[in-house]
From Swiss-Prot:
InterPro entries referenced in this protein's UniProt entry, alphabetically: Beta-tubulin_BS (IPR013838), Beta_tubulin (IPR002453), Tub_FtsZ_C (IPR008280), Tubulin (IPR000217), Tubulin/FtsZ-like_C (IPR037103), Tubulin/FtsZ_2-layer-sand-dom (IPR018316), Tubulin/FtsZ_GTPase_sf (IPR036525), Tubulin_C (IPR023123)
Gene it is expressed from: TUBB9
Subcellular location: Cytoplasm, Cytoskeleton
A cellular-component GO term for this protein: plasmodesma
List of residues binding Mg(2+): E69
Protein name: Tubulin beta-9 chain
Length: 444
C-alpha cells in the first residue's frame, strides 16, 4: 500500500489537520473511537493510506502533531476526534515560537526537532511502502513556518526519494495576523523552493472571499475556512484511497504538474462549493462542475489565474460519471480559453476520476493548477519584506536568535528569482524558446 504520512505543525497546521482528519474519518466510516462503522467494504479497502490498524480493529491516523506550545494540542485532544490519535505522536514544547521564524527554525524548534523525527521514523517504519509526506502549516507564524521548514529539510535528508507535499497557508494581502509575516513567509518560501516537491498555496483572504461570496456566510469562522481546505486535501488524495477509473498519486501529480523543478507552487480549487447546511440540493453535472472548478473566484489563494497563464493543471473528479464526458469538458475548457494556457506544453491538463464521491455529494471535483499568476502572491510578500528589511525593522528579534542578515538577503533574492522565473515562462512563446536559450548561454 502506498501510505502517506501526515504532519501538522503550529496552530494553523494543527487546526487544519484536525478538520482534515474529521473529513477523512467521515469518508472511511471511522468513528471518534477509531472503530469502523462504515457501510461498504470500499471504505476499508485502502484505508491503510492514512490509517494504521492497531489491536482490536482500531484505526489510528498516520499523523504526527507538533507545536512549540501546548495550547492548540490540548484543545485538539479534547475535541471530537482527539482520542483517535496515537498519544505518543503529540510532540510539543512549552515556550512557544512567538511568531518568530528564527525561534522555530534555529532555537526552540531545533531543540524539539529530534523528538519529532523519532516519531516520524517510527511511523515511517510502520509503512509497507511509504509514498510520501504531507505537511500542513502556515508561513506567517513561527512554528509552522520555522519549525515546519526545518522538519521538511530534515525529512528530505533522511528520505530523499519520497514525495514531500505541503499545504501552506500564505499571509493574506489585507488581513494580517502579525507584523513580521513577510519575514517569516519569505524565509519559509526560501526553504520550500529547495526542499518540497509540491506546495498547495492557500490563503485566508481568498477563503474568506469564498465564504462570503459563494457560500453566503455572514461571519465565517476559521472552522469554515478549514472545512474548505480539508475538502481540497481529501480530493487531492482520493485516488489513492478509493478505486477509480483514472488514478493518480502524489508522484504522478508532480510529474504532470511540474515542468521546471522550482515552479511547484499550485493554486487549488474545489467544486461544488456549497455551505455546510445546503449540501443536499446540489446535484451538479460534469459541465457545471468543470465550469465552477475553473472559475477564478473559486481559487483558494489570492492570485487571479486570469492575470497569468497555466503551465499545467490537473483535475480530480469524484463520483459516478462518464470519463468521456470529463475528457470532453476538459478539452472544451482548454479550447475556449487557449490564451490562458501556454502553447508550448500541448495537452497540459490531466484529469483523473475516482468513483466514490465525498460524503453528502453526488459528484465533486478538485482542481490543482500550476499558473504563472501565483507570482502575485510572492510579489506581494516580497514588497512587504523589502519595505521592512530596508529599514532593518524588527530584525533584532531574528539576529538575537543567532540569524545572520545575509540569510535574509538570500531569501529575498531567491523569492525575486522565483517571481522572475514565473514571469519568463508567462511571456515565453513557442518561437522565442531557442532565442532565450542562446541568450542564457551567452550570459553564462
Amino acid at each position: 500500500m502506498r501510505e502517506i504520512l501526515h504532519i501538522q505543525g503550529g496552530q494553523c497546521g494543527n487546526q487544519i489537520g484536525a478538520k482534515f482528519w474529521e473529513v477523512i474519518c467521515g469518508e472511511h466510516g471511522i468513528d471518534q473511537t477509531g472503530q469502523s462503522c462504515g457501510d461498504t467494504d470500499l471504505q476499508l479497502e485502502r484505508i491503510n493510506v492514512y490509517f494504521n490498524e492497531a489491536s482490536g480493529g482500531k484505526y489510528v491516523p498516520r499523523a504526527v502533531l507538533m507545536d512549540l506550545e501546548p495550547g492548540t494540542m490540548d484543545s485538539l485532544r479534547s475535541g471530537p476526534f482527539g482520542q483517535i490519535f496515537r498519544p505518543d505522536n503529540f510532540v510539543f514544547g512549552q515556550s512557544g515560537a512567538g511568531n518568530n521564524w528564527a525561534k522555530g527554525h534555529y532555537t526552540e524548534g531545533a531543540e524539539l526537532i529530534d523528538s519529532v523525527l523519532d516519531v516520524v521514523r517510527k511511523e515511517a517504519e510502520n509503512c509497507d511502502c511509504l509514498q510520501g509526506f504531507q505537511v500542513c502549516h502556515s508561513l506567517g507564524g513561527g512554528t509552522g513556518s520555522g519549525m515546519g521548514t526545518l522538519l521538511i529539510s530534515k525529512i528530505r535528508e533522511e528520505y530523499p526519494d519520497r514525495m514531500m507535499m505541503t499545504f501552506s497557508v500564505f499571509p493574506s494581502p489585507k488581513v494580517s495576523d502579525t507584523v513580521v509575516e513577510p519575514y517569516n513567509a519569505t524565509l519559509s518560501v526560501h526553504q520550500l523552493v529547495e526542499n518540497a516537491d509540491e506546495c498547495m498555496v492557500l490563503d485566508n483572504e481568498a477563503l474568506y472571499d469564498i465564504c462570503f461570496r459563494t457560500l453566503k456566510l455572514a461571519n465565517p469562522t476559521f472552522g469554515d475556512l478549514n472545512h474548505l481546505i480539508s475538502a481540497t486535501m481529501s480530493g487531492v488524495t482520493c485516488c489513492l484511497r478509493f478505486p477509480g477509473q483514472l488514478n493518480s498519486d502524489l508522484r504522478k501529480l508532480a510529474v504532470n504538474l511540474i515542468p521546471f523543478p522550482r515552479l511547484h507552487f499550485f493554486m487549488v480549487g474545489f467544486a461544488p462549493l456549497t455551505s455546510r447546511g445546503s449540501q443536499q440540493y446540489s446535484a451538479l453535472s460534469v459541465p457545471e462542475l468543470t465550469q465552477q472548478m475553473w472559475d477564478a473566484k473559486n481559487m483558494m489563494c489570492a492570485a487571479d489565474p486570469r492575470h497569468g497563464r497555466y503551465l499545467t493543471a490537473s483535475a480530480v473528479f469524484r463520483g459516478k460519471m462518464s470519463t468521456k464526458e470529463v475528457d470532453e469538458q476538459m478539452m472544451n475548457v482548454q479550447n475556449k480559453n487557449s490564451s490562458y494556457f501556454v502553447e508550448w506544453i500541448p495537452n497540459n491538463v490531466k484529469s483523473s476520476v475516482c468513483d466514490i464521491a465525498p460524503t453528502g455529494l453526488k459528484m465533486a471535483s478538485t482542481f490543482i493548477g500550476n499558473s504563472t499568476s501565483i507570482q502575485e502572491m510572492f510579489r506581494r510578500v516580497s514588497e512587504q519584506f523589502t519595505a521592512m528589511f530596508r529599514r532593518k525593522a524588527f530584525l533584532h528579534w531574528y539576529t538575537g536568535e543567532g540569524m545572520d542578515e545575509m540569510e535574509f538577503t538570500e531569501a529575498e533574492s531567491n523569492m525575486n528569482d522565483l517571481v522572475a522565473e514565473y514571469q519568463q515562462y508567462q511571456d515565453a512563446t513557442v518561437g522565442e524558446e531557442e532565442y532565450e536559450e542562446d541568450e542564457e548561454e551567452e550570459e553564462a
